């Protein structure tokens, strides 16, 4: 008996990574709109998106994140979410998506369960005050040196990156 199901083998799987696919799209359609956020009054072409993604990916690496590290995003749908997703892919980080409806206890569980090293979080969304919940979970944030957070409740968490809300 087979332990797995054999599916269709045609068409073949696409080779490459998500980050490589974005770079290929930017080469093929540099001036075509790739990301539109009406709520943020933002429109980016593939070339502009790739430039912002690569700048963010470089920023993640300069902060000391390394390929294989877990970076979480806790935010409603906004441009920064997409930028974070692609930037994580471009520099080999593992993206952990946190439900924007989660409260502090669920955030605590999620961050600890998967060993998140960095958290990218919006300031707030609807009634959820992400910054306040994060500070309650890791009160050491206020006195920590940027990039050197040490928190008792989430030992793996070293950095919190706040999305400014615009």
Regions found by a protein language model. Give the residues of each.
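Flexible, non-catalytic linker and terminal segments flanking ANL/adenylate-forming cores
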Residues: 1-16
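Flexible, glycine- and charge-enriched loops at secondary-structure boundaries
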Residues: 11, 42, 46, 97, ...
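A short N-terminal helical cap/helix-turn-helix that marks the beginning
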Residues: 12-34, 51
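Conserved AMP-binding/adenylate-forming core of the ANL superfamily
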Residues: 14, 34-86, 103-108
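Aromatic/hydrophobic pocket-lining residues that form π-stacking "cages" and hydrophobic walls in ligand
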Residues: 22, 84, 134
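Extracytoplasmic/periplasmic beta-strand context in beta-sandwich domains
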Residues: 32-33, 69, 132, 158
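Structural core segment of the AMP-binding/adenylate-forming
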Residues: 63, 91-166
């Amino acid at each position: 008996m087979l332990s797995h199901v054999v599916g269709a083998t045609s068409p073949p799987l696409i080779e490459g990574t998500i980050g490589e696919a974005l770079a290929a799209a930017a080469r093929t359609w540099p001036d075509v709109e790739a990301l539109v956020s009406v709520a943020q009054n933002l429109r980016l072409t593939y070339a502009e998106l790739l430039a912002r993604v690569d700048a963010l990916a470089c920023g993640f690496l300069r902060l000391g994140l390394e390929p294989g590290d877990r970076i979480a995003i806790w935010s409603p749908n906004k441009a920064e979410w997409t930028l974070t997703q692609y930037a994580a892919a471009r520099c080999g980080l593992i993206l952990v998506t946190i439900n924007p409806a989660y409260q502090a206890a669920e955030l605590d569980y999620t961050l600890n369960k998967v060993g998140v090293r960095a958290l990218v979080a919006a300031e707030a969304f609807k009634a959820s005050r992400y910054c306040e919940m994060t500070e309650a979970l890791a009160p050491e944030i206020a006195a920590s040196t940027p990039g050197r957070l040490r928190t008792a409740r989430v030992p793996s968490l070293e950095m919190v990156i706040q999305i400014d809300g615009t």
